[in-house]
């Protein structure tokens, strides 16, 4: 059994992508490999085969390994629900919410869960490919660390350090990170990968030579800047990302502070007939064919922000002019009359008035609903697959006209009597070809082109493995992975 860990000099250095690439590359070598991330902080999550939730990046990495996602792949998931606190999910199940100070004291317990999951995976697979979090050199977070070098030291594994050259300062990032590690941690770093390089590698070579001489560690390769990958991100969305013009159907997604599972919109971002725009603070909602209220980790707080930004009035105007509106998960809850949080699960206990566009109310309960589901859309009887991740129980007359008939006999969501509003708890609505096409036609798009989102994702995973073969030192990688 071999464990190899990828750590980064910064957030968004390329850790998730590199782990995905290495997983598929190893699979091509005939090696049974499994992804692992000890601790993840993200609002994008996926439902696992064993009925829990993990970070979405680990679900993509599982696909790279041709495995079903499992809670052991990401034993600790932190889902921020305020500026200072987060819901703590252990082995796929929410156990509590706590602030940063309380979580620091909880890390010993969390580490036990991390090591138990790693032990199970390492007993079942010859290679465990691990992704770190953020940077291992955050001085204020090093005590009790379970996400980076604290984990690497505990399981005695080698580390690859990746840095993003596109941001500038790559040599300072790599050398500075190394300098801030302890002597034993420095010894764990077996080499560097430089990510997102543009230009002639010959111009970079003097810097690479200096880096190897300065640190005594090899550069395992330089990965090129790739602009058109279609793999889900695990962290926050850039509201400037994905803005396209000259498309047929205009779709607007208001970006609220606690937006969750924004990966729901990746298929729309890639669709050639859709102009998808994320609207952030200070931006008015423009005229559009479809507005989608996304999921939220703090529904009442995001409702207040929506009103403060004047977006509630923009949504009402949008509907008056015949536009279509979809609410997904937290967005569904916002569309109703009221949202009640008697236990204070998402902040202070209390109730908030919803937008009042559909006749139902939601009560947030401690037990979270986690399911992968399949069913049929009320629109065109289109096949739909997706997943539920929510703590709310919604009741009311509007549910008598459901949006989805689920295969397990349940109904989901609602469609308004005037057919302008569709609300659902299902994430992943647009990933299926049939359901995506049906929803786009409902929103006003004619002659819809069908895209196979799953095939696009699989193609990109293969492309990443090709980049490993072409640009990294595969002989050294095989040695680090214990592969002959």
UniProtKB/Swiss-Prot annotation:
Key words of the record: Cobalamin biosynthesis, Glutamine amidotransferase
InterPro entries: Class_I_gatase-like, CobQ/CobB/MinD/ParA_Nub-bd_dom, CobQ_GATase1, CobQ_N, CobQ_synth, GATase_3, P-loop_NTPase
Record Pfam families: CbiA, GATase_3
Record domain GATase cobBQ-type: where: 248-435
UniProt-listed CDD domains: CobQ_N (cd05389), GATase1_CobQ (cd01750)
Biological pathway: Cofactor biosynthesis; adenosylcobalamin biosynthesis
Catalytic residues (UniProt): 329 (nucleophile), 427
BP terms from Gene Ontology: cobalamin biosynthetic process
Keyword Endoplasmic reticulum assigned: no
Top-rank taxon: Bacteria
Annotated GO MF terms: ABC-type vitamin B12 transporter activity; catalytic activity
Function: Catalyzes amidations at positions B, D, E, and G on adenosylcobyrinic A,C-diamide. NH(2) groups are provided by glutamine, and one molecule of ATP is hydrogenolyzed for each amidation.
Family: Belongs to the CobB/CobQ family. CobQ subfamily.
PANTHER family: COBYRIC ACID SYNTHASE, DETHIOBIOTIN SYNTHETASE
HAMAP family: CobQ
NCBIfam families registered for this protein in UniProt: cobQ, PRK00784.1
Protein name, per record: Cobyric acid synthase
The organism's taxonomic lineage, starting at the top: Bacteria, Pseudomonadati, Pseudomonadota, Gammaproteobacteria, Pseudomonadales
């Amino acid at each position: 059994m071999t464990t190899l860990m990828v750590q980064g000099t910064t957030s968004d250095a390329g850790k998730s992508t590199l782990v995905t690439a290495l997983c598929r590359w190893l699979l091509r070598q005939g090696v049974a490999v499994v992804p692992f991330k000890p601790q993840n902080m993200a609002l994008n999550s996926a439902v696992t085969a064993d009925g829990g939730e993990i970070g979405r990046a680990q679900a993509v990495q599982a696909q790279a390994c041709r495995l079903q996602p499992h809670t052991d792949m990401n034993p600790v998931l932190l889902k921020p629900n305020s500026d200072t606190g987060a819901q703590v999910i252990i082995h796929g199940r929410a156990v509590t919410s706590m602030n940063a100070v309380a979580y620091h004291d909880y890390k010993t317990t969390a580490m036990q869960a991390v090591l138990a999951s790693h032990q199970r995976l390492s007993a079942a697979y010859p290679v465990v490919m691990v992704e770190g979090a953020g940077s291992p050199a955050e001085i204020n977070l090093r005590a009790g660390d379970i996400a980076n070098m604290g984990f690497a030291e505990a399981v005695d594994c080698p580390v690859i350090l990746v840095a993003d050259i596109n941001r500038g300062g790559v040599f300072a990032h790599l050398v500075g990170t190394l300098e801030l590690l302890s002597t034993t941690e420095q010894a764990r770093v077996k080499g560097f990968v430089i990510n997102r390089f543009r230009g002639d590698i010959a111009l970079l070579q003097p810097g690479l030579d200096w880096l190897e001489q300065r640190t005594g560690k090899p550069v395992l390769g330089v990965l090129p800047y790739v602009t058109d990958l279609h793999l889900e991100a695990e962290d926050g969305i850039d509201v400037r990302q994905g803005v396209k013009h000259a498309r047929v159907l205009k779709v607007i997604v208001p970006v609220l502070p606690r937006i969750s599972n924004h990966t729901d919109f990746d298929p729309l971002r890639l669709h050639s007939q859709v102009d998808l725009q994320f609207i952030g603070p200070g931006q008015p909602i423009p005229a559009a064919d479809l507005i989608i209220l996304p999921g939220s980790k703090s529904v009442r707080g995001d409702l207040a922000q929506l009103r403060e930004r004047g977006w509630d009035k923009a949504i009402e105007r949008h509907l008056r002019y015949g536009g279509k509106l979809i609410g997904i998960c937290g967005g569904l809850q916002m569309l109703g009359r009221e949202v009640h949080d008697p236990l204070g699960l998402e902040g202070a206990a209390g109730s908030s008035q919803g937008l009042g566009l559909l006749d139902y109310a939601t009560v947030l309960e401690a037990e979270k609903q986690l399911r992968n589901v399949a069913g049929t859309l009320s629109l065109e009887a289109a096949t739909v697959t997706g997943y539920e991740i929510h703590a709310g129980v919604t009741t009311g007359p509007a549910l008598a006209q459901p949006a989805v008939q689920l295969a397990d006999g349940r109904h989901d969501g609602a469609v308004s009597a005037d057919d302008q509003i569709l609300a659902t708890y299902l994430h992943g609505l647009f990933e299926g070809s049939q359901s995506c096409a049906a929803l786009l036609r409902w929103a006003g798009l004619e002659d819809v082109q069908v895209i196979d989102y799953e095939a696009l994702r699989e193609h990109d995973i293969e492309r990443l493995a090709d980049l490993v073969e072409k640009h990294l030192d595969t002989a050294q990688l095989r040695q680090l992975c214990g592969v002959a």
